[in-house]
Each structure stands twice: as C-alpha cells, then as structure tokens.
C-alpha cells in the first residue's frame, strides 16, 4: 500500500483527490487542512508521498515543505493554482526538493477531474518511487530561500553582457541538449549556475512541466545564472551564452531559418508521450547538426524519454552524460540511457557542469 497525505485548505479538493486514489485500491490516505496539520500528520502517519497546496492558512505550503525536508524528508508533489504568484512559489518549492508539480485547472475542479485523473495517479505513483536524500546543500537552500543572493545585480549584468558579446563573436559550433523530468528543476538549479557567461554553445532544455510554470522557471534561472535563460515562447535564434527552456505542454525542436538555426515551440505530438519531449528535441537536432557537434545530458526523471535518441546521438559521434543513480530523484530516464549503452559518462549532478564546460570549450577551440 502507498501511504498518501493530501494537504489542501479546500474540503472539496481534499474529498475529490481522496476519491481518486481510493478507487485505485492500493492507497492508504490521510488528509490535512493546514500546513501545521500536515506536519503533525507526517510525524504520525509517515506517508510515502505528500501533496501540498501552495496557499494554506496559518502555514503555507512552501513553509511546510521546508519543515518536511529538514525534519522528515520524503517525496512531495505541489498542487498549485494557475497564477503567476503561485507559479513562482511552486518553483521555489521545487528548488527546495519537491519532486513534481500538478497544475490545478482554472475552471471548476470537479468538472476537470476526469481529465486530470491519469496525470494525478501517474505523478503520485512516480513520486512514490523517488529517492529523497537530505543534504547540507538542500538544508542551506531551505534556510536561505528568501534571501536575495545577488549582492550586486548591476555588476553581474555588466559582466554577463560583456561575456555574451565575446561568446557571440563566432557562430556556435554545437549545441547542448538537456532532458529531465521528475526532480529536474532542482537538478537544473545545480547544473546551470555553474556554466560561465562565455560558454560557447547554446543550451536547449526539455523539462517536463506544465505550461504555466516554464516561463516563471526560465525567469528564475535567469536571475541565478551567468548565462541568459529564456523560454521558447516565440521562435528563438540559437546563440552562444543562452539557455532555452522548452514551453510546457508543447514540444521544442531545432528548425532552420535563413538567419540560422532556431529553437521553436511546436504542438505536442501523440506519438511522443511526454512533453516537452526530450526524444523529439534530440531527433530534431540530429537533422541539422553533425552528431559530433552535439552534447546530450539526460538527468533525473521517470520513464525513458530521450534515452533512445541520445543513444543514437552517441552512435553518430556525439557525447552524452547520464546522471548517476546516486543523485537522481528517479533514475528512470538516465538509467535507461545507461542500459541502452548510450552514456559516454555517468556522473553525479554536481559534476555534470564541469564535463559540459570541458567538452564545450575543447570543441570550440578546434
């Protein structure tokens, strides 16, 4: 049995969610109305998975999550309304260790429940398999979540602008492709800030997230990274010094234009089950780049999205990195890349950036 704690201040939402999982037959469920009740229930019930609403009376979901991750770490899924404020809070939660997010529908919750049911069940089952490892780094992020880390934003912007101009002096020789899902936002928060502003290759990312959150995620990363970070909400020229985040609920591909190659958001296709699709992103890059000029990184996530395409990328002369099982929240996608024999390197998340920098700089110098 999977022990599930549902924390939401709406009695209707609690009842509806409880009904969904009781029908599955293998869930034992408790509910909480406030963050404080949720903390007490975590201690008493010891759930395998917790769902948290962002907005709750007394103690909000973000504060409750921080306490859970410090005192009794376990998989937490945020269930958030589709507002800009909640999107930012939800991304803060994922930086603190929440493994996934489900967007509440904008209309009547009960009317949308049948559409959401498969996603709800799949997400919670995936979260139940996640491995949460408390670390000093995570504790530090929790304790300093609300402190502004940028002591001199203007100085940082000036340095970043100068480095971008140096990086753009020559056409980008290649492309970094990153795919991730469950646990990905926290992993990207570790990897991307390590890349320098003059990194010579553009970086294209497919992170499985609802559309409401990818724009806010790009803005958050842009504040924390030396590289420019943007959402692919419009066609974007692929340029050095820039990270491109695929828009949620769509796919992101590489496409040609007279001015050069671009990152393009396109409608999701049914033959690719996850979105933004890592597999489709890599397939499109292989149509326009020599395999030797591609670097694939597959990180934490349920399932196998991207593993086959990245194995093909390696066979065509490219290089790939699979996140090690020791740091992946869910070793599904990177594990499948390893099983297919398509991983050039297998590295813990903290070491991936160094390999990306070494390979990118070496190839740029060729």
Curated annotation (Swiss-Prot):
<dbReference type="InterPro" id="IPR008248">
    <property type="entry name" value="CheB-like"/>
</dbReference>
<keyword id="KW-0963">Cytoplasm</keyword>
<feature type="active site">
    <location>
        <position position="208"/>
    </location>
</feature>
<dbReference type="Pfam" id="PF01339">
    <property type="entry name" value="CheB_methylest"/>
</dbReference>
<feature type="compositionally biased region" description="Basic residues">
    <location>
        <begin position="156"/>
        <end position="166"/>
    </location>
</feature>
<feature type="region of interest" description="Disordered">
    <location>
        <begin position="149"/>
        <end position="168"/>
    </location>
</feature>
<dbReference type="Pfam" id="PF00072">
    <property type="entry name" value="Response_reg"/>
</dbReference>
<dbReference type="GO" id="GO:0005737">
    <property type="term" value="C:cytoplasm"/>
</dbReference>
<dbReference type="GO" id="GO:0006935">
    <property type="term" value="P:chemotaxis"/>
</dbReference>
<dbReference type="InterPro" id="IPR000673">
    <property type="entry name" value="Sig_transdc_resp-reg_Me-estase"/>
</dbReference>
<comment type="function">
    <text>Involved in chemotaxis. Part of a chemotaxis signal transduction system that modulates chemotaxis in response to various stimuli. Catalyzes the demethylation of specific methylglutamate residues introduced into the chemoreceptors (methyl-accepting chemotaxis proteins or MCP) by CheR. Also mediates the irreversible deamidation of specific glutamine residues to glutamic acid.</text>
</comment>
<dbReference type="InterPro" id="IPR001789">
    <property type="entry name" value="Sig_transdc_resp-reg_receiver"/>
</dbReference>
<feature type="active site">
    <location>
        <position position="305"/>
    </location>
</feature>
<dbReference type="GO" id="GO:0008984">
    <property type="term" value="F:protein-glutamate methylesterase activity"/>
</dbReference>
<feature type="domain" description="CheB-type methylesterase">
    <location>
        <begin position="171"/>
        <end position="363"/>
    </location>
</feature>
<keyword id="KW-0597">Phosphoprotein</keyword>
<feature type="active site">
    <location>
        <position position="181"/>
    </location>
</feature>
<feature type="domain" description="Response regulatory">
    <location>
        <begin position="3"/>
        <end position="119"/>
    </location>
</feature>
<dbReference type="InterPro" id="IPR035909">
    <property type="entry name" value="CheB_C"/>
</dbReference>
<dbReference type="InterPro" id="IPR011006">
    <property type="entry name" value="CheY-like_superfamily"/>
</dbReference>
<dbReference type="GO" id="GO:0000156">
    <property type="term" value="F:phosphorelay response regulator activity"/>
</dbReference>
<dbReference type="GO" id="GO:0050568">
    <property type="term" value="F:protein-glutamine glutaminase activity"/>
</dbReference>
<keyword id="KW-0145">Chemotaxis</keyword>
<comment type="similarity">
    <text>Belongs to the CheB family.</text>
</comment>
<feature type="modified residue" description="4-aspartylphosphate">
    <location>
        <position position="53"/>
    </location>
</feature>
<protein>
    <recommendedName>
        <fullName>Protein-glutamate methylesterase/protein-glutamine glutaminase 2</fullName>
        <ecNumber>3.1.1.61</ecNumber>
        <ecNumber>3.5.1.44</ecNumber>
    </recommendedName>
</protein>
<keyword id="KW-0378">Hydrolase</keyword>
């Amino acid at each position: 049995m999977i022990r599930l704690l549902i924390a939401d201040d709406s009695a209707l939402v609690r009842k509806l969610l409880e009904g969904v999982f009781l029908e599955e037959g293998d869930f034992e469920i408790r509910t909480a109305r406030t963050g404080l009740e949720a903390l007490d229930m975590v201690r008493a019930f010891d759930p395998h998975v917790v769902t948290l609403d962002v907005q709750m009376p007394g103690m909000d979901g973000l504060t409750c999550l921080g306490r859970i991750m410090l005192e009794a770490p376990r998989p937490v899924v945020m269930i958030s309304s589709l507002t800009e404020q909640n999107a930012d809070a939800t991304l803060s939660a994922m930086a603190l260790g929440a493994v996934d997010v489900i967007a509440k529908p904008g209309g009547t919750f009960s009317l949308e429940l049948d559409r959401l049911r498969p996603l709800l069940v799949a997400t919670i089952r995936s979260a139940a398999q996640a491995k949460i490892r408390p670390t000093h780094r995570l504790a530090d992020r929790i304790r300093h979540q609300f402190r502004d880390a940028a002591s001199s934003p203007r100085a940082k912007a000036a340095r970043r602008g100068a480095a971008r101009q140096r990086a753009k002096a020559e056409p980008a020789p290649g492309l970094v492709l990153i795919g991730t899902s469950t646990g990905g936002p926290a992993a990207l928060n570790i990897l991307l800030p390590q890349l320098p502003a003059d990194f010579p290759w553009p970086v294209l990312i497919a992170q499985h997230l609802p559309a409401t959150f990818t724009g806010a995620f790009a803005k958050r990363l842009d504040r924390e990274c030396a590289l420019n970070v943007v959402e692919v909400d419009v066609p974007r020229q692929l340029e050095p010094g820039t990270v491109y985040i695929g828009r949620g609920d769509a796919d992101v591909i590489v496409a040609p234009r007279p001015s050069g190659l671009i990152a393009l958001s396109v409608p999701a296709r049914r033959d690719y089950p996850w979105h933004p699709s890592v597999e489709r992103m890599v397939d499109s890059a292989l149509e326009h780049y020599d395999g030797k000029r591609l670097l694939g990184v597959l990180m934490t996530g349920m399932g196998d999205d991207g593993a086959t395409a990245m194995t093909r990328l390696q066979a065509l002369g490219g290089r790939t990195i699979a996140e090690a099982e020791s740091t992946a929240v869910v070793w599904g996608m990177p594990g499948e890349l390893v099983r297919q024999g398509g991983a050039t390197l297998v590295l813990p998340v903290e070491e991936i950036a160094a390999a990306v920098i070494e390979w990118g700089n070496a190839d740029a110098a060729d």
